[in-house]
């Protein structure tokens, strides 16, 4: 695995758990999407946008279900499905209800938006010590739904649960596009 794809060194990780995480995250996804879209345009002439998985849509009874394209072991022609080959929590087809809290984006527009424990303001909380993916810190929005979905999908041994491998699972991109 190319180390650039799995770089969660302190330099890379410093973008997590900080007030600037949301703006860094948007730039990261924007760049990834632009690279893929340019290649799709070159090969097919079609426009392309990164899809997202809106598991927080309370109006959709199937919102928590992992999209079928990411569950089927094979494609319609019988070939192995590259979207489902990555290790995930055994038997997961849907996020359990109650584990991913609903979140109001409108609330984030308020000047006194509080998302953390003990009144911490912001997406990822304050400055922290050494990086520990999915650890306990004060930024509740980054922790839930972001980290909760990583843990639920990845389980103990799945790629989504391992920050060094999470980006290799195609569900990572749907999840992160939704977070964005």
Which residues make up each language-model segment?
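C-terminal accessory segments of proteins
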Residues: 1-180
